[in-house]
């Protein structure tokens, strides 16, 4: 079907053509014929890179041409939301259009009343959940919902929130029932998911670039048709590396294409990129290497003390045309790598599996170095769905006539071919009725449904029976009854002719935390030790909460360090029975040294903690400290509220308490604060006394920063 045949106005058709769209892919045509332009709800279950975004865009344009209601686009990740915002922002350029696109994710937020005035809003699922919690006025104006990566309903972490959002929307619990466009990877129970959502199903295995799936074993590549070949694999090169995954990747680079290698650990990702880079560089021209040298310089932070070994290794690999990508890198580094791989400057990229579910970085050849990944319980095989998402990155539309994915096998290739290549992705299983999820969302339902009158258990059961999990669980009512009793025990709900939240329950609902965790925190605070500071005690408690992540284990080398810290801080117990010498992890050590001002390079050397890890730890810790602070405030414990306010500032800035007055000044971060303190400028009063010239002469300050400081404090 040609773009011209769509029932859209001429200006919109011309815009789509200007973006390179002339003809619809088969799944896109199927979606149009199924009714996405006619207000029909549709679940599109197709492989990666099969044009799902254009389907959402067409539905959006059609909806807004006929209705005044809003379109919301839900994504599971902030990076994906930013990507979609860039794509949908282009719609504002349609001739004669007054269309406005906004974003709300926590990292990237439109300002002021832009969400109220926007026609299209891009949100993460968690942000949408918060908007529903705060009952923003515009949520009653939603006419079309696009849910990207809807198969993540089966994810134990993010799934329950998404499931509750969709249940509320599809049942008309908030506003009118909207049109729903759900975008999913290929799953085996897509018909069940479509029926639950009230969607028609569009299902296809079609890809814009044909995919060849194969398994490598013992110098031989066996494809999905069981045809064996050596491919173009250079056995000498493979032997030189002793790692077939690298040889397979380099083979593609030699042909002038890009390759993506999935490794199962961060260390193997770094090692593979470092090793492969030496040989990638041999294939590159002088001007390509010069460009890569410039890119590598942008990777290194300006401050020497922020240059960790990991970042230096990344910069060195990039010089050679290779790179690695994992959660240990900070967002700045990851963005550079993603951009330069898309631009074609980086030829070989290694990554942990997290990239498969993240931003779209296709390559001619994808190599899966192992089908095992390390998890909480040791090594475990990846799911078929994970495998399909990885190999779905193979083949770049407009560049490749074929994409290749290759599993590196140990032993016979047959079991890999049968299980992964021929396999059907697992069925989605709802996570909404797990103990923690059910407590959170039960309290949420009661808090939002009983403004004027209590909600009955019958109504609660009726609502949860409309969730994806509630459809088939014959123990639904029993599970709900058990969790309701728990909430009453926690003094978060009352049952007097129906359920209503107590003031405490309402508070915990606003905080969006497991009621059991909130109950435990309350018990700790009631038993708090008076007269002391509790900094270490708070950090110990936070790192032991179920909601805390990422959690890193402890090595023998760190045992002695922890014992030493415990001896110094045992007087900082938060509550009487707190055992500071037990239940601690490396994450606690990282936090303690972070708020003491330790540099990134030293953190990396001492604890193997990288900037990306530290960012996640401090962000999550600050959030949990805020929750604890709000619980302390609810119980009118001002002493702990004040202490937690200070702790949160230290977590945010990564400094000792004595630097806090300095880091509150814009452009004075932890590095400059340390330098100012060294020169006896301990606070704003000291800075007011010094001349502009003397302030500018201090290392790492300079005239521009000095003027900025003076403007703020005088």
Where are these regions (language model features)?
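Helicase-associated low-complexity/disordered flanking segments
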Residues: 1-30, 34, 38-42, 285-315
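Conserved P-loop/Walker A NTP-binding site and adjacent catalytic elements of P-loop NTPases
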Residues: 15, 21-174, 178-186, 190, ...
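Conserved C-terminal RecA-like helicase domain
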Residues: 73-74, 82-85, 89-102, 267-348, ...
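Conserved two-lobed SF2 helicase motor
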Residues: 116-133, 321-324, 341-356
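Conserved interdomain linker/interface between the two RecA-like ATPase lobes of SF2 helicase motors
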Residues: 183, 190-275, 323
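A short beta-strand element within the Helicase C-terminal
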Residues: 348, 355-372, 404-406
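Conserved segment of the helicase C-terminal RecA-like domain
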Residues: 372, 383-419
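C-terminal helical accessory/scaffold domains
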Residues: 439, 444, 481-664, 670
């Amino acid at each position: 079907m040609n773009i011209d045949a769509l029932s859209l106005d001429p200006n919109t058709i011309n815009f789509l053509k200007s973006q390179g769209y002339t003809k619809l892919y088969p799944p896109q045509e199927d979606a149009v014929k199924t009714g996405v332009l006619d207000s029909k709800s549709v679940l599109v279950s197709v492989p990666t890179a099969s044009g799902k975004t254009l389907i959402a865009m067409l539905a959006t344009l059609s909806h807004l041409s006929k209705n005044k209601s809003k379109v919301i686009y839900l994504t599971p990740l902030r990076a994906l939301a930013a990507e979609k915002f860039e794509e949908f922002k282009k719609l504002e350029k349609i001739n004669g259009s007054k269309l406005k696109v906004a974003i709300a994710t926590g990292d990237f937020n439109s300002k002021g009343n832009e969400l109220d005035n926007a026609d299209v809003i891009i949100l993460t699922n968690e942000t949408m959940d918060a908007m529903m919690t705060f009952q923003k006025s515009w949520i009653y104006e939603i006419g079309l919902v696009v849910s990207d990566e809807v198969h993540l309903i089966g994810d134990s972490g993010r799934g329950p929130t998404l499931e509750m959002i969709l249940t509320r929307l599809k049942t008309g619990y908030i506003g009118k029932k909207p049109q729903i466009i759900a975008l999913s990877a290929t799953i085996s129970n897509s018909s069940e998911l479509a029926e639950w959502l009230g969607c028609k199903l569009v299902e296809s295995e079609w890809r814009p670039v044909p995919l060849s799936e194969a398994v490598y074993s013992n110098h031989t590549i066996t494809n999905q048709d069981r045809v064996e070949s050596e491919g173009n694999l250079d056995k000498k090169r493979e032997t030189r590396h002793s790692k077939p995954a690298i040889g397979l990747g380099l083979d593609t680079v030699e042909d002038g294409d890009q390759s993506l290698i999935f490794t199962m650990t961060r260390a193997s990702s770094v090692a593979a990129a470092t090793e492969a880079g030496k040989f990638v560089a041999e294939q590159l021209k002088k001007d390509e290497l010069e460009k890569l040298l410039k890119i590598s310089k942008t990777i290194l932070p300006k401050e020497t003390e922020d240059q960790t070994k990991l970042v230096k290794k990344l910069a060195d690999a990039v010089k050679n045309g290779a790179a690695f990508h994992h959660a240990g890198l900070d967002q700045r580094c990851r963005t550079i790598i993603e951009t330069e791989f898309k631009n074609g400057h980086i030829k070989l990229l290694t990554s942990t599996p997290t990239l498969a579910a993240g931003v779209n970085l296709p390559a001619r050849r994808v190599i899966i170095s192992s089908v095992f990944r390390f998890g909480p319980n040791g090594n475990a095989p990846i799911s078929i769905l994970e495998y399909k998402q990885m190999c779905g990155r193979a083949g770049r539309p407009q560049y490749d006539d074929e994409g290749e994915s290759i599993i590196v096998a140990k032993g016979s290739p047959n079991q890999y071919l049968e299980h992964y290549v021929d396999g059907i992705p697992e069925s989605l299983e709802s996570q909404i009725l797990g103990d923690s999820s059910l407590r959170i969302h039960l309290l949420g339902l009661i808090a939002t449904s009983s403004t004027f009158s209590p909600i009955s258990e019958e109504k609660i059961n009726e609502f949860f029976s409309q969730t994806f999990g509630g459809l088939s669980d014959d123990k639904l009512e029993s599970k709900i009854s058990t969790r309701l009793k728990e909430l009453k025990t926690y003094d978060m709900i009352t049952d007097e002719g129906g359920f209503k939240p107590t003031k405490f329950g309402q508070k915990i609902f606003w905080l969006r935390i497991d009621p059991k965790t909130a109950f435990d925190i309350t018990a700790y605070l009631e038993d708090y030790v008076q007269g002391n500071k509790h900094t270490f005690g708070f950090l110990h408690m936070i790192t032991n909460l179920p909601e805390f992540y990422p959690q890193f284990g402890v090595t023998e080398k760190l045992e002695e360090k922890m014992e030493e810290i415990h001896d110094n801080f045992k007087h900082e117990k938060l509550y009487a029975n707190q055992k500071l010498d037990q239940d601690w992890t490396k994450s606690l050590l990282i936090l303690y040294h972070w708020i003491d001002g330790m540099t990134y390079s030293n953190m990396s050397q001492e604890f193997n903690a990288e900037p990306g890890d530290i960012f996640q730890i401090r962000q999550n810790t600050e959030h949990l400290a805020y929750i604890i602070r709000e619980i302390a405030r609810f119980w009118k414990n001002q002493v702990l509220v004040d202490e937690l306010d200070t702790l949160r500032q230290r977590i945010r800035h990564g400094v000792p308490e004595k630097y806090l007055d300095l880091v509150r000044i814009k452009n004075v971060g932890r590095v400059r604060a340390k330098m100012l303190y060294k020169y006896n400028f301990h606070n704003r009063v000291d800075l007011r006394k010094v001349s502009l010239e003397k302030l500018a002469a201090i290392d790492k300050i300079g005239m521009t920063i000095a003027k900025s400081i003076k403007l703020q404090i005088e």
